[in-house]
A protein has these predicted regions:
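Basic, ligand-binding patches in group-transfer machinery
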Residues: 1-105
């Protein structure tokens, strides 16, 4: 099964979650990113920050980056697996868990 949405986390620390998320079926529309614990939304943002590295790799317009401010406690919950990061498609009809922490290659 292939998903239309792809997202990656590149950094998690005591203040920020940084990454990118992109809907291949709606390349000009930003997607929503959420940190969840069970069904509770603990933090959210829109992936619409401009990034030259995404543009150079041919990932849409390059405006698919995100940087989300989080608390130190939420950072620890993410590292312990007690909270997860999810991304929607551009229509917010489907949600996908981002399970990978990696750099864009």
């Amino acid at each position: 099964m292939s998903f239309a949405v792809r997202g990656y986390i590149e950094r998690i620390d005591s203040e920020l979650v940084v990454g990118w998320a992109y809907d291949f079926k709606s390349p000009n529309q930003p997607v929503e990113v959420q940190v969840r614990q069970d069904s509770r939304i603990l933090a959210d943002t829109i992936a619409d920050l401009s990034r030259d590295d995404l543009l150079e790799k041919g990932i849409g317009s390059g405006r698919h980056g995100f940087s989300m401010t989080i608390s130190n406690d939420l950072c620890n919950q993410l590292y312990r697996g007690e909270a997860e990061i999810w991304v929607s498609d551009a229509r917010s009809e489907s949600w996908y868990r981002i399970a990978e922490l990696r750099e864009l290659n």
